[in-house]
């Protein structure tokens, strides 16, 4: 929300409150309070940065305006409002059945909205814990040729970006994730660390809770100093205040603790536990001068009056200049740009934003359906009170007073529903946090905070107005004389009420159809997703992540020897059928490589620009995963690091070698001008879907070897988790400094691949079911009221010879006509709305005919049942009794 929009909102709020001020005082009152508001314009503009005290001060200002407006009202109005409230509460208590149903219906809608809003508030709306977070952005290399929008960059590129731009006040860098091993203590602990430039913390505008952050001098002299996260300080040092100056052994080397960050600080993710200067990175020497080493990510702070669009245009121009100045080959690097992403968007991701907004839209629909239901209940109850209102009008009560009476009752009902809804939301939030997939950012920040409480209060008052307007509108248009003469039953007022109720049913059905279509599409997508083959057999597989202390000296042959010994020892354990190691089974990175096929020109098919990932593996990993061999052979035990052989996956074979046998062909990594180190293709294996089941297969090349972080997988004949202790012991016996973590099973791993979609689909289906139940109850209520209103007519029909089946058709036909109109309207709306969730679908069109037809029949079936019960009751009407009663 922009500064101008924020101020307009508060100005609008003052003007709305001014409506209750007497007209003769209204102009002066508004001028006075608007002038007061303009004095606070600076605070309003900085709303996202204000502490709780200043936010409460602004809210108190609005409350003060409201109380002042009430104070200006005549005393008589205050007394009348108290009388209305007392009378309304008595009437609600007099009809406990109606009151209970209305409160529960509204509480479900309000509770669902509050629970989902609490998630949206924590993930999307709450400011990040930095100074002016809305001016922070991540800067990535944009590689259109490989379709990668967020690639890392090199240190020389960072220096050029920093010196050539005019719109960022500063740029800083950090590594792209740096797992380290804390080797001091009883056993090694693997934590996520980051190498960052000295200006990162000042750029973020965050000061340490203890000590200080490292300086440019620390960076220049390669000082081994470290800043700890609040969590690591508590866990590793027991929150000792004398931690500054103590040593912490990282990857076998001692670093001095110089600072501890605040409890709410994290960057770039909440997994990051410590920060070190960029110059102590194990890969710094030799790599920091490489123009095309993509080891770094860049964060920038926009100048006060700069926009993200302006920054994007400027950085694109800088990127183009650099690509032309430092090309490796025209084919490889020309056209590189820079992608500027607002930090909040970077943290949440566009798909998550869309999913949360879809869920928020779903609960809004549920709330509207609940309001329509309660409005129908209020209309039916209002019809029974027609004579009461007519008598009060005859005794001198004005229509305004009667309308205010009904709105007061609605507000009281909404207030109680809001309190119950808040309780349901509290339970719902706990359930959401418990069942939500762990990759939702800021999950631990989801709480019922003052902002959520304000939202609940606002929603409660809004619902009170929504369901109270229909009966209040009817009272304002009714003629007391007609009501007194006709007694309310079967009157023209009853006809108008049935028409209004019918309109609300149409709206309910349309909203329900829209929800059911969205849920149906998500269900069909999820079913399609579950049928996707992950490329390996997950049953009976144990996975453990193994990390060695990382250093430039401990790469290559030593690492390969370590993993070879571990694999041999684990393979000897009872029940183990096969063991292997792979660099990154979950493929936690983007394609970052390219190849050139021997004998092809630079512009030939399958040259350097295609998406490609290179993985180091042990010789028997495919046997452990049960990945099918399509052509050629697997690696042998003798083929280790530096062997000039590779295995490719099916996607790469199809893309680079269409219609030919790739076995025996040679490739090299990089473009045509790269070093001529050729690798022979000895095998083709099936594709592994490892990031997300719905993600398109990526071209992969597998090389024999190992790095310091590997996934160890063992296929066993019994329960995989029973082997955990033995595997830990074998790894520690080979190298006590190795950290073992991330233990899981293959089955659980595959479930995680679709956890986010399962969560979204489950919630949407739940809300759709609630909507269907509410719509069915609404149809039942309207048809039951219609039968009660037409008892006299039905009695006459039966007395004149109509059969029970005729009455049944009459009542069901009336309800089904309304439902049919609602379904048709909902299908048309769904045809447009379903396109908004296209990005969330997999293997299903947004206009899938089967889903639309299925939803229509489902709602028509539920409506048929809801209509049948009142219709069956109508067939039991005694003609003589109904005529005598009239």
Where are the predicted features?
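Mid-to-C-terminal secondary-structure elements
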Residues: 193-214, 224-354, 430, 522, ...
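Alpha-helical transmembrane segments of integral membrane proteins
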Residues: 73-99, 343-349, 377-404, 408, ...
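Membrane-helix entry/capping segments
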Residues: 52-98, 148, 175, 179, ...
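Membrane-proximal extracellular/periplasmic loop immediately following the first transmembrane helix
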Residues: 128-178, 294-299, 533-595
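Membrane-proximal juxtamembrane linkers immediately C-terminal to transmembrane helices
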Residues: 116-141, 165-167, 207, 268-270, ...
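Interfacial "coupling" helices/loops that link adjacent transmembrane helices in transporter permeases
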Residues: 370-414, 777-819, 823, 836, ...
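Negatively charged linear elements and acidic catalytic determinants
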Residues: 1-104, 481-495, 876-886
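Short, strongly hydrophobic transmembrane alpha-helices
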Residues: 95-123, 127, 369-371, 415-418, ...
């Amino acid at each position: 929300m922009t500064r101008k929009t924020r101020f307009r909102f508060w100005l609008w709020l003052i003007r709305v409150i001014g409506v209750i001020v007497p007209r003769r005082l209204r102009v002066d009152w508004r001028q006075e309070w608007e002038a007061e508001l303009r004095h606070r314009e600076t605070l309003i503009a900085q709303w996202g940065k204000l502490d709780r005290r200043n936010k409460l001060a602004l809210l108190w200002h609005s409350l003060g305006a409201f109380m002042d407006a009430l104070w200006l009202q005549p005393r008589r109005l205050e007394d009348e409002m108290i009388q209305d409230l007392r009378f309304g509460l008595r009437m609600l208590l007099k009809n406990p059945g109606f009151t209970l149903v209305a409160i529960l219906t509204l509480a479900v809608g309000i509770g669902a909205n509050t629970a989902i809003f609490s998630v949206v508030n924590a993930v999307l709306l709450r400011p990040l814990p930095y100074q002016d977070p809305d001016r922070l952005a991540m800067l990535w290399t944009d590689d259109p040729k490989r379709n990668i929008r967020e690639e890392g960059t090199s240190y020389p590129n960072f220096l050029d970006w920093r010196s050539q731009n005019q719109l960022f006040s500063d740029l800083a860098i950090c590594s792209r994730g740096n797992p380290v091993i804390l080797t001091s203590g009883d056993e090694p602990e693997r934590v996520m660390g980051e190498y960052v430039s000295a200006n990162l913390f000042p750029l973020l505008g965050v000061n340490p809770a203890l000590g200080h952050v490292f300086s440019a001098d620390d960076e220049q002299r390669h000082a081994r100093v470290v800043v700890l996260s609040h969590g690591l300080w508590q866990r590793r040092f027991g929150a000792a205040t004398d931690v500054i100056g103590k040593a912490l052994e990282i990857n076998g080397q001692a670093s001095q603790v110089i600072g501890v960050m605040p409890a709410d600080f994290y960057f770039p993710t909440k997994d990051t536990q410590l920060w070190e200067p960029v110059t102590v990175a194990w890969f710094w020497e030799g790599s920091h001068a490489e123009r095309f080493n993509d080891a770094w990510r860049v964060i920038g702070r926009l100048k006060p009056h700069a926009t993200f669009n302006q920054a994007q245009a400027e950085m694109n121009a800088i990127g183009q200049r650099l690509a032309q100045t430092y090309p490796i080959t025209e084919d490889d690097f020309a056209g590189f740009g820079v992608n500027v992403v607002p930090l909040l968007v970077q943290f949440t991701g566009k798909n998550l934003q869309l999913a949360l907004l879809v869920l928020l839209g779903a609960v809004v629909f549920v709330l509207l359906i609940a309001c329509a239901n309660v409005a129908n209940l209020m209309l039916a109850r209002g019809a029974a009170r027609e004579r009461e209102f007519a008598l009060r009008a005859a005794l001198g009560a004005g229509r305004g007073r009667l309308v205010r009476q009904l709105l007061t009752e609605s507000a009281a009902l909404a207030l109680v529903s809001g309190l119950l809804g808040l309780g349901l939301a509290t339970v719902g939030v706990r359930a959401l946090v418990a069942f939500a997939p762990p990759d939702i950012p800021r999950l631990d920040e989801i709480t019922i905070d003052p902002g959520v409480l304000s939202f609940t209060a606002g929603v409660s008052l809004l619902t009170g107005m929504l369901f109270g307007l229909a009966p209040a509108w009817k009272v304002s248009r009714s003629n007391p004389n007609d009501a007194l003469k006709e007694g309310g039953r079967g009157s023209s007022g009853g006809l108008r009420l049935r028409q209004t109720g019918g309109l609300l049913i149409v709206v309910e059905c349309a909203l329900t159809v829209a929800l059911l279509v969205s849920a149906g599409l998500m269900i069909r997508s999820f079913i399609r997703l579950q049928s996707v083959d992950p490329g390996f057999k997950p049953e009976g597989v144990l996975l453990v992540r193994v990390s060695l202390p990382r250093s430039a000296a401990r790469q290559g042959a030593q690492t390969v020897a370590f993993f070879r010994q571990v694999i041999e020892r684990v393979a000897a354990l009872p029940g183990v059928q096969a063991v292997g190691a792979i660099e990154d089974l979950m493929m936690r990175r983007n394609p970052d490589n390219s190849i050139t096929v021997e004998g092809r020109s630079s512009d030939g098919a399958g040259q350097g620009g295609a998406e490609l990932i290179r993985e180091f593996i042990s010789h028997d990993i495919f046997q452990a995963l049960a990945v099918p061999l399509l052509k050629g052979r697997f690696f042998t035990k003798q083929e280790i690091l530096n062997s000039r052989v590779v295995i490719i996956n099916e996607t790469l074979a199809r893309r680079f070698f269409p219609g030919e046998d790739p076995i025996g062909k040679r490739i090299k990594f990089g473009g045509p001008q790269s070093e001529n180190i050729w690798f022979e293709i000895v095998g083709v294996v099936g594709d592994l879907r490892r990031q997300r089941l719905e993600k398109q297969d990526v071209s992969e090349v597998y090389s024999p070897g190992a790095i310091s972080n590997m996934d160890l997988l063992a296929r066993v004949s019994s329960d995989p988790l029973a082997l955990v202790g033995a595997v830990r012991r074998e790894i520690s016996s080979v190298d006590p400094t190795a950290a073992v973590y991330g233990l899981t099973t293959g089955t659980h791993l595959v479930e995680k691949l679709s956890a986010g979609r399962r969560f979204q689909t489950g919630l949407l289906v739940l809300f759709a079911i609630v909507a269907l139940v509410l719509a069915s109850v609404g149809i039942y209520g309207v048809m039951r009221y219609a039968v009660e209103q037409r008892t006299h007519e039905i009695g006459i029909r039966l007395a004149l010879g109509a059969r029970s089946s005729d009455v049944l058709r009459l009542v069901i036909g009336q309800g089904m006509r309304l439902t049919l109109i609602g379904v048709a309207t909902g299908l048309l709306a769904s045809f447009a709305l379903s396109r908004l969730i296209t990005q969330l679908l997999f293997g299903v069109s947004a206009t899938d005919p089967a889903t639309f037809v299925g939803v229509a029949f489902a709602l028509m079936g539920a409506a048929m049942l809801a209509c049948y019960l009142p219709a069956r009751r109508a067939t039991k009407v005694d003609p003589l009794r109904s005529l005598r009663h009239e």
